[in-house]
Amino acid sequence: SSDYLSFKFDKFAPNQLNMYFQGDASVSTKGVLQL
């Protein structure tokens, strides 16, 4: 679910992007899909 995707995104994305997307789980999910 979102926590899993957020964790994976954190592993592949720089900390700056992680902090940006971390504000909203839905935004984080969309960011992963767009990448």
Swiss-Prot record:
Keywords: Calcium, Glycoprotein, Lectin, Manganese. The keyword Glycoprotein applies. One of its GO terms (molecular function) is carbohydrate binding. The keyword Flavoprotein does not apply. Highly glycosylated. InterPro entries: ConA-like_dom_sf (IPR013320). Binds lactose or galactose. Homodimer. Belongs to the leguminous lectin family. This is Anti-H(O) lectin 3.
